[in-house]
Amino acid sequence: MKKFIVTVVAFLSIIIIAPITEFKPFIHLQNEVRQYIDIHINKETISAENKLDTPKKQQFAFNNIQMNMSKSDVEKTLNKPKRVTFNEYGTKWYTYYDGDYNNFIMVSYIKDKVNALYTNQNIITSKSKIKYNTPKSVVRQRLGEPETEIVKGRVRYEQNNKEYDVFHKNHIYTTVFYDKHRRNNVTAVLQVSDAMENRLKEQYGAPSKSLADSFELQNFDLVNAERKQHQLSTLKYSKQNSETARKHSKDMAKNHYFDHTNLKGQSPFDRLKKDGITFNSAGENLAYGQVSSIYAHQGLMNSIGHRKNILNDTFKILGVGVDFNDEKQP
């Protein structure tokens, strides 16, 4: 499956495919049984070992991790991160999860204190009883009216996207993302401190190869965390597919277009075949105008065609490619 995520900071291209395989009904049955067992074991493990407590100090907690916690306390609970990548704030995302993307959470620190948090899984607790799948109307009843703008320097950025709400309280921006295909219920939450948000002087982060590489890996993790939440098998990362996706992102950024078909008339499938990649089926997602990998992913999940690609149970391999245009847009 090819996924293209192009943000106003970068062009992001993601490819997800189902490789050519022989039909093996017995192996297929075995895999289905294993997946069924894994799902139910995971559910039991989460309830038995990961008791989610209502936070006492902060409004929200994700897998019992709260804003302003020390890095040492976080890692006493979550152990060491599975991945560390750069973000648009000029700091790093530390990505934690158990096993195969269970209890997925992203944490960013300033001076070894939690200043940003994100999850797209059912590990959200809050003082106001907001959690995964809480209706949008209930969120607004309990958190109040969302922000209508964010000011950076002399520029005001309107916040009027119906797919998420931004709340600002106690020096923390809380962005609640909604799943419009599931009755506008909570599907993810991002928290960013004032100190972290103020590090981003403009709407988008400064383009760099390290940021592009980081956006690619973050999107790979976000897709797998989403699939795990929906009880689907996770995908394997493909350098070859990523290179195909990356070339298309670079082409779109350089030549100022945004389309599945490039200027030579080649479709995603043509480009895969040209690069020697064989597949039974493939899909491509494109996104543009998002400020980060998180916003790009959440936007794709609310687009029905892109959502079907992300949650396609036949896809096995994922490739991601990111590039930035002249206006700092991914």
Predicted regions and their residues:
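Positively charged n-region of N-terminal signal peptides that target proteins for export
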Residues: M1-F4
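A well-ordered secondary-structure block
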Residues: Y118-H171, P268-P330
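Solvent-exposed, polar/charged alpha-helical surfaces in well-ordered, non-transmembrane soluble domains
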Residues: S72, K76, S137, Q141, ...
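Hydrophobic membrane-insertion alpha-helices, especially the h-region
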Residues: V6-T21
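Intrinsically disordered, low-complexity
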Residues: N170-Y237
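Second-shell loop/turn segments in exported
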Residues: Q58-N64, N122-I130, Y204-S214, K228-S238, ...
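A cross-family detector of function-defining hotspots
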Residues: P25-K111, V138-V186, Q191, D313-K328
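Short, well-ordered surface patches within globular domains
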Residues: L211-D270, T314-L318
